[in-house]
Amino acid sequence: ITSIICCTEYIAAGAIKACDDLSLKIGKDISLITYDSLVISHLTNPSLTSVSHPVRELGNQAVNILLEMRSKKGKNKNYMATPTIIERGSVAKLLKS
């Protein structure tokens, strides 16, 4: 295993504990990424690389779609938001062969 991708910071906290138990150094021996960037990402050592979602934008779009559906003007819509990767110290550097 070269990396662990966690869907929440709370799961990442468990992964950090497991890596520690196995004497694996995050950011050197193994990479760890989380899919939210709340509080824990900043408190770990090394800080966790994370995929951050535009939560406010997603919420606004959801409300707009619901209001359109309620007024019966809206059709089924798809909305795609672009996440941002916030690089921190938890990703190991790749070795060139």
Short names for language-model regions:
Residues I1-K96:
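Flexible loop/turn connectors
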